[in-house]
Regions:
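Positively charged n-region of N-terminal signal peptides that target proteins for export
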Residues: 1-9
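Exported/periplasmic ABC-transporter solute-binding proteins
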Residues: 4, 21, 28, 33-34, ...
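Short acidic/polar micro-motifs at solvent-exposed secondary-structure junctions
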Residues: 97
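C-terminal motif of bacterial Sec signal peptides marking the signal peptidase cleavage site
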Residues: 15-19
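Short beta-strand-centered segments that line the small-molecule binding cleft or hinge
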Residues: 103, 107-113, 117-123, 127-133
Length: 301
């Protein structure tokens, strides 16, 4: 009997020792919750509608430097959406902003600078989350072919007899003034856009300056020989490359990034069909076919 008890105790002891020696099975762990950044897919580029849209007229405001490209883009859009009429208004971004503020009907606003679109957003004109920074550009200094100018680049602008220059409310004019600040020709005591034409003339030794209301007028003034040199976007310069020489293209470290944002604008008079067509047109502007047109006109994608 004692032997049986001893044997049972020995077996029990061995079982207890085995339990203590064996490692505890790991508890099942829950997969870590994925972070929002990891699970949230990047916003997809919207696709334009394939089916024909209802008849509508979209009011499009575009920076003057975009006009050439849009003369190709709008007919291309109408190949797939013949019921939609795109009516465009091309001028300086500053003028277009003022028109929106004054109550002009606008559905889509395509600026040559961020500041105008930021103002639309701050003042409640822009539809939330509709802004797309679609294009880039650079500032160029041009002269008529055979002009014989002594100017070789921005650094010796003072050698010009006359300069065509957009005013400070025009993005190209503001970028030019920013460049002159960076080069030490303007003193930098105020914002670039606030330097008047007279300020710029005085800083350049009294050179005659033809103040232009948009960049297209600068381009035409140089192309026609009315002014010796002028500052325009590279895309503008390239569009008249047979008539002008490009003296210099400025690095964006001198001008700041030149971005072209497009956005939707609150239009209280717009019908549902008009709003749908405006949204669709912005989606169309982001397609490869349209990007190819912008690249053809030397915009930066």
């Amino acid at each position: 009997m004692k032997k049986w008890i001893a044997l049972l105790l020995a077996v029990a002891m061995m079982a207890m020792l085995g339990a203590c020696a064996a490692p505890a099975a790991p508890a099942a762990t829950e997969a870590p919750a994925a972070t929002e950044a990891a699970t949230q897919a990047p916003a997809a580029t919207p696709e334009p509608t394939v089916a024909p849209l209802e008849a509508a007229e979209v009011q499009l405001f575009i920076a003057a430097s975009l006009e050439g490209a849009f003369k190709e883009i709008i007919p291309l859009y109408n190949e797939s959406q013949p019921n939609v009429t795109i009516t465009y208004n091309a001028d300086s971004s500053g003028t277009l902003l003022t028109q929106v503020q004054e109550g002009f009907a606008c559905d889509v606003f395509f600026s040559a600078a961020v500041s105008q679109v930021k103002t639309l957003e701050d003042e409640g004109y822009m539809i939330a989350n509709s802004r797309v920074d679609l294009l880039g550009n650079k500032l160029a200094l041009i002269t008529l072919k055979g002009s014989g100018t002594a100017v070789t680049g921005f650094a010796d602008l003072a050698k010009a007899k006359s300069i065509a220059l957009a005013d400070g409310s025009v993005p190209a004019g503001k970028y030019t003034r920013q460049l002159l600040i960076k080069l030490g020709m303007l003193d930098g005591t105020k914002e670039a856009k606030d330097y008047t034409t007279a300020d710029v003339s005085a800083a350049l030794g009294g050179v005659e300056i033809n103040e232009c209301s948009n960049v297209s007028k600068v381009k035409e003034a140089v192309k026609e020989g009315s002014n010796e040199v002028g500052t325009v976007y590279y895309s503008d310069a390239y569009s008249v490359k047979d008539d002008v020489d490009i003296l210099e293209v400025a690095d964006n470290t001198l001008t700041g990034d030149i971005l072209y944002p497009v956005c939707r604008v609150n239009n209280p008079e717009a019908t549902a069909a008009q709003s749908a067509a405006a949204d669709d047109f912005i989606a169309f502007l982001q397609t490869d076919a349209v990007k190819a047109i912008f690249e053809k006109y030397m915009f930066i994608i």
